[in-house]
UniProtKB/Swiss-Prot annotation:
The keyword Cell membrane applies. Its main location: membrane. The gene is atpG. Produces ATP from ADP in the presence of a proton gradient across the membrane. The gamma chain is believed to be important in regulating ATPase activity and the flow of protons through the CF(0) complex. This is ATP synthase gamma chain. One of its GO terms (cellular component) is proton-transporting ATP synthase complex. Gene3D superfamilies: 3.40.1380.10, ATP synthase, gamma subunit, helix hairpin domain. Belongs to the ATPase gamma chain family. F-type ATPases have 2 components, CF(1) - the catalytic core - and CF(0) - the membrane proton channel. CF(1) has five subunits: alpha(3), beta(3), gamma(1), delta(1), epsilon(1). CF(0) has three main subunits: a, b and c. The lineage of its organism: Bacteria, Pseudomonadati, Pseudomonadota, Alphaproteobacteria, Caulobacterales. It is a peripheral membrane protein. PANTHER family: ATP SYNTHASE GAMMA CHAIN, ATP SYNTHASE SUBUNIT GAMMA, MITOCHONDRIAL.
Length: 290
């Protein structure tokens, strides 16, 4: 059995850990509000752009549709973009995203597709490096705050690969922020743009619009921006989900530390009481012997 000194040291160590987890919980809670506002503010723009694209796509013939909308006519080469956070200590948040990415990569590979991978966030890079191997073509850090610059850089690389004929279909794997307690791993097709399965076309209230320039030219401008917008929106959703998951994980850790402190304190008190009782018995026995 551990000595009283060892037990006191262990209780002190757990208390120190509890202070750290409590502080991390409070920091995550403070950052969550800002991240949640940013994610929610970005949604209407991304949804509106998807609606505009769906409306414009309805007036475009198959031959005149841009490649980012119509595709290359093949689905042999796939690119999977996986977005996680750079840091951990957030429960199973990053693992759930990586698991969804693994399932998609393995499913595509089983179908005989040529799969390549781009990661955003160190956790995705570290966990997928062995699975992807040489198929991991680029890695990016998510950063402490999602930025348009990173989204534009990743978007440019994706579109460069698409225009060069290196990929036919692009998938984005990230975590949708549903609520503080719910973050859902999501797989979304970026290229070709999924207008039919995405947002409904705009309600034009019976009006007929003539576009100048025509729909094809507008889509040629909007579709590249849509890729960037969807990437930025996904990283913002990830950020909110990460802080929510971290806040929950640190709250659980703080509670568990409290339970452990209570258990160790009870054990310490019992051991101390037993030791005192033993010493008293020895003193009484010694006195009686005299």
């Amino acid at each position: 059995m551990a000595s009283l000194k060892e037990m006191r040291n262990r209780i002190g160590s757990v208390k120190a850990t509890q202070k750290i987890t409590k502080a991390m919980q409070m920091v995550a809670a403070a950052k969550l509000r800002k991240a949640q506002d940013a994610a929610q503010n970005a949604r209407p723009y991304a949804q509106r752009m998807a609606s505009v694209i769906a409306n414009l796509a309805a007036g475009v013939s198959g031959d005149g549709a841009p490649k980012l909308l119509a595709g290359t006519g093949s689905d042999r080469r796939h690119l999977v973009v996986v977005a996680t956070s750079d840091r951990g200590l957030a429960g199973g948040f990053n693992s759930a995203i990586v698991r969804a990415a693994r399932e998609r990569i393995n499913a595509l590979s089983a179908e005989g597709k040529d799969v390549r991978v781009i990661t955003i966030g160190r956790k995705a890079r570290d966990q997928l490096r062995r699975l992807a191997g040489e198929r991991l073509v680029a890695t990016y850090e998510a950063g402490s705050n999602p930025s348009l610059a990173v989204a534009e850089e990743v978007s440019a690389r994706i579109q460069e690969m698409f225009e060069a004929g290196e990929v036919d279909v692009v998938h984005l794997v990230f975590s949708s922020f549903k609520s503080v307690v719910t973050q859902q791993p999501t797989v979304r097709q970026l290229i070709p743009a999924e207008v039919a399965a995405g947002q409904a076309p705009l309600d034009l209230k019976g009006a007929t619009y003539e576009y100048e320039p025509d729909e094809e030219q507008i889509l040629e401008t909007l579709l590249p921006r849509n890729v960037t917008t969807q990437l930025l929106s996904a990283t913002l959703e990830n950020q909110a989900g990460f802080y929510a998951a971290q806040m929950t994980a640190m709250d659980n850790a703080t509670r568990n530390a409290g339970d452990m402190i209570a258990s160790l304190t009870l054990q310490y008190n019992r051991s101390r009481q037993a030791q005192i009782t033993k010493e008293l018995i020895e003193i009484i026995s010694g006195a009686e012997a005299l």
